[in-house]
Swiss-Prot record:
Entries under InterPro entries matching the protein: OAF3, Zn2-C6_fun-type_DNA-bd_sf, Zn2Cys6_DnaBD
SUPFAM superfamilies: Zn2/Cys6 DNA-binding domain (SSF57701)
DNA-binding residues: 25-52
Stretches for region Disordered: 879-929
Source organism of this protein record: Saccharomyces cerevisiae (strain ATCC 204508 / S288c)
Domain observations: The 9aaTAD motif (residues 985 to 993) is a transactivation domain present in a large number of yeast and animal transcription factors.
High-level lineage: Eukaryota, Fungi, Dikarya, Ascomycota, Saccharomycotina
Name by which UniProt lists this protein: Peroxisome proliferation transcriptional regulator
Comp. bias regions, Polar residues: 879-928
Subunit structure: Heterodimer of PIP2 and OAF1.
Entry superkingdom: Eukaryota
Amino acid sequence: MYFTDESSPAMNRVGKKRNRLSFVCQACRKAKTKCDQEKPRCGRCTKQNLFCIYDVARQAAPRNPNKDATIARLKKEIRYWRNKTVDLTQEKKDFYTALKRPTEELAARRTCKSLQENSFPISLYKTHPRLIMTKVMKREINPLSEKYLIFQDTFLKTLIASVLLSCSRNSMIPALNADISRSRTQPCVKNNVVKMREVLLKNSKYESQRKSINEFTDRLLQRKNPEEQIAVNKVISLLYSNRESSYLEDTCPTENDYSDLLKGYINEIEKTLPPKAIIEQYLSHFFEHIFHLIPFASKEMLEESIHTTVQYNELGEVRLSMGTTLIRNKMENLCILLLILRIAYISLTFIEDKIEDYSPYITKEMLEQYPIQSEVIFLAQQILASENWCACANENTISCLLYIWCAFVFSPTEGDFLLEQPSDVIINLVILIGTSIGLHRDPSDFPALNHPEASDKRLLNLRRIQWLSIISMATLESSLKGRLLVSPLSMIDLFIDVRDPNCVEIYKKRVKKDLTGSESDEQLLEIHEIFFHRAQLALFLSDLNNITISYSGSVPMDTLETLRVKANELLKNKFQLRSVDINIYDEEKTFQKLTFNSILNSISLSGQILGKLMMLRASIALMLYFETLAMERSECLSFFYKYFFQCCADTISLIRFFFLYFNGSYEKVLSSLVCFITTKVIQLAVPTTMFTLLVIIMRVELAKNMLLVKCNECNARGDISDLPEIKEKIKSLDTIKENFERLLLEVYLLASQNLRFKYFYIFKMLTLFDVFIQRLRKGQLFSGLFVKVDKDLTTKKIATMLELTLGINLDKSDHLIDRLKGKNLTVNFTLDQLYQIIKEFDRIKNIGVADPQNSLNPSKPNMKDNTPTIELLLNSSVENESVPPYSSSNDPTNVGNASTYSLAHNISNQNNEENMPPSIGSSESNRAAPNLNFMPINNNYNNSGSNINNNDNVKLPSNFKNYYDPPMSSLDISMDVPDIFGSLDFFDYDLLFQND
């Protein structure tokens, strides 16, 4: 081959870049297609629902532009806009003419406009990428994850950063500057945690609370507790056996020929299992109250195996009789026995005292004397690993893995599984093993399973409900974490066509065909039906999650709305709570029906809360998305309001569930013995709810402040025509703000009393909210954002951390208020829109936050109980003194002395007596918390100065230029709550403060 001059390397130099302006839109330019240059959107972008952006002004202009060409182009643009103005003017005339005499053409035009709005393109994942990065980890934050709001919302990020930057009162910053890998090396951290523990222990009421306090404070100080450090190791132990290389045998010539491995496991199981009477009591409780919630095994087959295998000596101690055949099957059923005993124990630990009032089988002394420790999980996993379960899987293996997942998820002592812990590993293992044994196909597809001599007929429906459970658990978990589960629909496509409108009836026919004729067949059919509906709900939520993290392109808005409507209809029609008519002539049957309905109601209530939680997260993501777009495109403002309102409505719906659950309204349809599942679901929903309340409150407060400034400016100019509407808006915003503040304080109190000492995750999150609530009571939740930051005292490490995680740039902090004003579109809402939000409060107006006479569980502390919370530190030095409750200056809400509004501020009474709210009588009759009294719109704002002829300006406090807020109780204390927060790694969001 010969090289010519044209192909020589000398000719491969990069030529000069030509600076030519492109007048077509970006989408057409990238696609290299013709653009009609129509404004504001070209024809191609309009047709394909693409974003149409003309970036002529942003392009680098040529060095020597051609003047004649520029003049010609400008003249062409003038002609274009002149013609467009004429056309629009004519359209306007036609519009008003059509208003007087409606035509079919106008109706068609309106329909077209509505369709165009519904097909508005949405691209959440592509336009809002977020990767949190530290030296030891990286994590992507997706739109439906819990942390998306924290890292995407400017208001919330700023609030959190303002807490972290309070160096003078916060011990977190010094701890970070030093050795952050060992928090106990910081004296300020250790001293505050020790002081916190002493006060909490002193005020604790139950032994379980004292145990949790010691455990949680040890975690804060990073003290190693072997029992708590093996949770991850237990999951890993599924994959290997720490015994020997050989596996368990399935048959043996005689019992004397057992392998050493089998003998060792037999001895361990005999030592682990409690006496006969205790086992029977635990099993009775499990099968009566819990089994139908998690029916991952066949009750009859399990009981038959246990009856054959588990024998007892004269003292009632367990002695195993394994026989010589089917040894592995018997060991697998023993593993199931160990796991369900552990789950039964977990469910009973949620009742603080007087267990005898709820369970006829278990007593408090029995729990204390024969606890089922978490070591049984490790033992069961070791037995499975010794069977080489990956290669020799069966239905029993699936049952064990599913019960292991449940034991981790629902146990508050095993870490925060289902949030960021390795329950992902377990459920994905279950999917792999389930597909390997054909669970993803209906059992009727396999002739071998239907052979009467080769297989047990009871396995057919067991396999069905196992696969439905796997689908539900895997898709719900991935959706809650905002992650993508690979093809969840393909997991069920071979099982049944869920798109068929009659799919439920088809599935029920299959189940009926394979029923065995036992007494429990009717209940089994109902369980299969509600599990099928739960799988449908999980698939809807998974579709919603998958759409929000789709990178392939934009999605029409109506696609998201259709999924929301379908999920809401399913929740409304198939997840309603059931009641039972009491039959005094057949008490036993009535009791059984009550118990079974309680189980179904637990599934329904959990499904409603999870469904509404995912709807709220979707609303949050869309609200933030349209908030950004509306700053550039005015037509998006209506969409922003739509999802802002939806956030308010979904939040109120979730809070309604919280109130009804904790005040005992569900006690007739929901047993306390199944509350461990519902409480876990509420734990998942509380953080998102509380953070959303903060976001709404700050936006509404800023909007009110901006309108107050506008009101003053109108008075100064003498322009009084708009004053009535502005003042009416201020009243409405004030109503919304104060009502949401009440909700935030009540949810905070409920979480403190019922969840703080059950879940370490909530314990740490509420420690952060202790700071927020303290600011809220002072009236500084919003104004505290604008405290001047001394950049000289802020280390580069802290500044970098804030920028990489929260996206806060301290160099631009001087323009913070301008950025927040620019982001706040709430000020543009109309009066009708504000009234619509206020109307939502009617849904919970008459719901009591706590009712001592009607509590779900008398062991749960009521509002009047002196429940130990970190807030007790605020008044630990002032004992036995009356504490005036929080009161609004216009419409006080009487929630009693122990409510959130009445926590201590006595230390500053002498110096701030003139600012104190009026005290409510301290008689016993005033201490019970009645219903919430939300403020009506006409009671929030003083109209005495709202005369349109009055040109006096509204008075603003000096701590914020345009700040106005009704007075809240003063709280100047000798010991700051932020010092306690200083020991935390940001409530388990280790992506913020991770050890180096």
